[in-house]
Amino acid sequence: MSLEEIANYIVSDGKGILAADESNPTCGKRFDSIEVENSENNRRDYREMLFRSKGMKGNIGGVILFDETLRQDAKDGTPLKELISNSGALPGIKVDKGLVPLVDGSDEVVTQGLDGLDERCSEYDSLGAKFTKWRAVIKIGDSMPSDDCINANAKALADYAAIAQSNNMVPIVEPEVLMDGDHSIDLSFDACARSFQALFDALENNGVNIKGTILKPSMVTPGSLSEKVAIREVAEMTVRCLKENIPSDLPGVAFLSGGQTELEATAHLNEMNKIGGFPWKLSFSYGRALQQSALKAWSGKSENIFIAQDELSHRAEMNKIAALGQWDIKLEDR
């Protein structure tokens, strides 16, 4: 498959992305909430449960993995990446190395991981990964985000994207504007717009093939400590921000859920697709908003596997329907 074919496939027909690339420490936090030990075997069992869910088929086009998972085998010896492929989804890999302060003492951060990235990508390509992901973090606060922060992260994302494409893998570029804080939806709109402008300028300057790239942005929402606004307002502001700042030849936008509840993430996505009138697919790349109910239902017990899989399958199906603009809250009744 070409880069363009891979990117288009991942978001085709309402399909989206299951973000299962939690680092081991983050996985530990999730497991703490259900009182399960954060062991290699438990991480494998949990992800095997997800990837064997019936609802993967037809609803999930790609799965983002952590390094460990790309190399792991299921209990019966089948590579986990093969379970993903068998469901009709493509395996992908998180390649960044986390956040460091932009400058000493700064509250702002930049993502590291460019050192040795070409070699890592070459290996991931040989292991069967079809796409990659790199997350940048933009904070809103006093004098934040600064131009320096936005530009440094845009450059790192563009450098990463060029390296991923040179190794035959689609880059997912993720400029996450954090919800943390009491900022207004207008400040969120401004931070997203500036991040998009800088990112696509940097991608173009680096010769990145936009048709073989996927954007994983935040939705335009008020800060988590601010009053919530109507679903329609989030949808309208987000669509406007994208239309004003994103090139039309980008194949897909796969939103992060960023601390939204499962239902909020689905409702917002649906409302945007009901608005319509944009050249790219608007889809999902959700972690917690796909996994939360499944994780709770599983709780580390093998006898709960089928109930947990039903939860994941349901959320995957609901989000596919939302990516087609056809979701309704009544569909949540089971």
List each model region and its residues:
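Alpha/beta catalytic barrel-like cores
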Residues: 1-127, 140, 228-237, 243-244, ...
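Catalytic core of soluble alpha/beta enzymes
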Residues: 179, 183-249
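Active-site glycine- and acidic-residue-rich loops that bind
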Residues: 145-153, 183-196, 226-228, 258-266
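Glycine-rich anion/phosphate-binding loops
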Residues: 45, 106-120, 145-160, 194
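Structured alpha-helical segments in the cores of large, soluble enzyme domains
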Residues: 117-131, 153-169, 195-206, 235-244, ...
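Conserved, mostly hydrophobic/aromatic
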Residues: 39, 134, 173, 215, ...
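Conserved radical SAM core fold
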Residues: 98-102, 137-143, 178-182, 222
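Short coil-to-beta-strand
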Residues: 86-95, 124-136, 164-175, 210-212
